[in-house]
Amino acid sequence: MPARAKSLDPVVYPETDHMGEHELQRFIAELLRPLIERYLKSRGVVAHVGADTFLYFAKGDPTQRIAPDVYVLEGVSQELAVSSWKLWEGTPAPKFALEVVTSDALKDYDDIPAIFGRIGGHELVLFDPEARPTSRKRARFTVFRRGAQGFQLVERTHGDRVRSEALGCWLRAVGEGASRRVRLAIDEHGDVLFPTEAEALEADRAAAETARASAEQARAAAEAENARLRAEIEELRRRRG
């Protein structure tokens, strides 16, 4: 991460706006953030994966800020824990961000993409858990990405998955109603989900149990074979005796 420019700044940059958020919005972020952190770490990518932290982008004006539900700062250590980020101090613009669309759809569909593009963000995904296939204005996934022509809308779908170029995997919508969540999928077509930490631990436990059972079966088979050979030897001795 670039060195921060330290200078005296009398402006107060709040850590929170003291406004509540919908529980579903929080639950989606709480599941997705550690998934992205573990996935990027597994690929050897150095990045800071955060959630709902203010990113200030205009020195001297604390109203100029954005707080993505989940975001990735490439090249920034995960070991850092800050109250807010200030882009003029060397913090890079987010490589990736996901915003859960709330009742304030105008803010999410119009304002956030405009700000994200203005500050140099690379990829923004809007996830709208309340979107319906019949909706013309809302979609389950809306993707904005920076390319040769600038920051533009590149995909809008009611499907259950979109490809994230920034992360190198798929984003998958799972569950229904209050159980709607966003997961990562890591195969070519987005079918294989990247496991949560609990799922990974359970898979390791199951694999260890399978290995233990296989070893026990092999031991029992070896003992049975040894017993059979000993019996044959004893039978031969008896016949010769």
For the regions a protein language model found, what residue spans apply to each?
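A short acidic/basic microdomain associated with nuclease active sites
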Residues: 44-56
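A generic secondary-structure signal marking the coil-to-beta-strand transition
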Residues: 28, 45-47, 68-69, 94
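Short acidic/polar active-site loop segments enriched in Thr and Asp
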Residues: 122
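C-terminal interaction segment
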Residues: 2-21, 38, 55-68, 73-119, ...
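A structured, charge-rich N-terminal accessory region that forms the first stable segment of a protein
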Residues: 21, 26-38, 48
